[in-house]
Swiss-Prot record:
Claim: Endoplasmic reticulum is one of the keywords in the record: no
Lineage top rank: taxon: Eukaryota
Gene symbol of the encoding locus: rsm24
Protein's recorded name: Small ribosomal subunit protein mS35
Subunit structure: Component of the mitochondrial small ribosomal subunit (mt-SSU). Mature yeast 74S mitochondrial ribosomes consist of a small (37S) and a large (54S) subunit. The 37S small subunit contains a 15S ribosomal RNA (15S mt-rRNA) and at least 32 different proteins. The 54S large subunit contains a 21S rRNA (21S mt-rRNA) and at least 45 different proteins.
Length: 258
C-alpha cells in the first residue's frame, strides 16, 4: 500500500482529538483562548484591545508561558504541531525532490580512499566533526612491495592484517572539512616516507599483536568442581536438617495450642 501523507495527517488529527478530549476542559479552553489556530499551524498571538485594559506584550507573553509550561494539553498541542509539520513536508516538499534522485553506483577501483563522517540531520546539536578514512594498502598505485611493507609499519595498530585495511580518524579541528584536509596531509606524508625509507626498514618484521584474538580459557578446574559438589551435598544435608527441625517445631506449637 502506497504512503498517503494526507491520510496520515487526518489520522494524526483524529488521534490528537481523542487524546485532547481526555485532558481537562479548563486547561484546553485556556490554551485556545490565548492562541488561534489556522489549518496547518499556530499563528500569531491574539492581543487584547487597547480600550479595555492597558497591557504590555512582553508581560503577557511571560504570563502565558508560565501558565502553559506545565500544562499537559498545551504540550500535546505543541507535539501535534511538530507531527503535522513533518506530514506537510512529506506531502508537499518530498515530491519536489524527485528530479534530484540519483541511482546507486558502486565505487570505481580508482577511488582508493574512502572518507566517512557522521551527519545527524534530525538533531540541532553540534555536528560531529570527526572524519575517518579507510583504504587498502594493495590498491595504492606506484608503490613496490617493500614500500607497502614500510607503510604498514608506519600506520601501526591502525592496520587490519586480515583485510589489508588501514583506518585513520581525525577530530583535531572543529570542522569536518578541515579534518579531511588534515587526513589528506597525513596520507601524503605516509606515502612519501614509505618511498623514502623503503630500503632502510624493509627487514623490520610486521607486528600484528594488536590484532590477535586473545582466546580466554573459561573451563573450570576439576579440583574446584569436586569441592563444589561436596559443598553442595553438605549444604543439602544441612538444609534438610533445618527444614525437619522447623516442621517439628511447628507440630509442637500446634499441640500446645490445642
Amino acid at each position: 500500500m502506497a504512503f498517503n501523507p494526507l491520510l496520515s495527517l487526518l489520522k494524526a488529527d483524529a488521534i490528537f482529538l481523542g487524546q485532547l478530549s481526555k485532558s481537562s476542559f479548563c486547561a484546553t479552553s485556556r490554551a485556545f483562548s490565548v492562541f488561534y489556530f489556522t489549518r496547518f499551524k499556530r499563528s500569531a498571538y491574539v492581543s487584547a484591545p487597547f480600550g479595555i485594559e492597558p497591557h504590555d506584550e512582553k508581560e503577557l507573553k511571560t504570563i502565558d508561558d508560565n501558565v502553559h509550561s506545565n500544562n499537559l494539553s498545551w504540550q500535546k498541542i505543541q507535539e501535534h504541531e511538530v507531527i503535522r509539520e513533518l506530514y506537510r513536508k512529506a506531502a508537499y516538499e518530498l515530491p519536489g525532490l524527485t528530479p534530484y534522485t540519483q541511482s546507486f553506483k558502486k565505487p570505481a577501483d580508482s577511488q582508493i580512499f574512502r572518507f566517512e563522517s557522521d551527519v545527524q540531520m534530525s538533531s540541532f546539536e553540534k555536528m560531529n566533526p570527526k572524519v575517518v578514512v579507510t583504504f587498502k594498502v594493495t590498491n595504492i598505485p606506484l608503490l613496490e612491495e617493500k614500500q607497502r611493507h614500510v607503510l604498514r609499519l608506519l600506520v601501526g595498530p591502525r592496520y587490519n592484517p586480515e583485510e589489508d585495511l588501514v583506518r585513520i580518524s581525525s577530530d583535531k579541528y572543529s570542522s569536518a572539512l578541515q579534518n579531511k584536509y588534515h587526513l589528506i596531509k597525513i596520507l601524503t606524508s605516509l606515502i612519501e616516507e614509505s618511498k623514502r625509507n623503503a630500503e632502510k626498514f624493509s627487514h623490520v618484521p610486521l607486528n600484528t599483536g594488536h590484532w590477535k584474538y586473545k582466546k580466554c580459557d573459561k573451563r573450570m578446574p576439576q579440583e574446584w568442581l569436586a569441592d563444589a559438589t561436596t559443598l553442595t551435598s553438605k549444604k543439602k544435608t544441612t538444609i534438610g536438617k533445618q527444614s525437619h527441625n522447623t516442621v517439628l517445631e511447628r507440630e509442637s506449637i500446634a499441640t500446645t495450642d490445642e
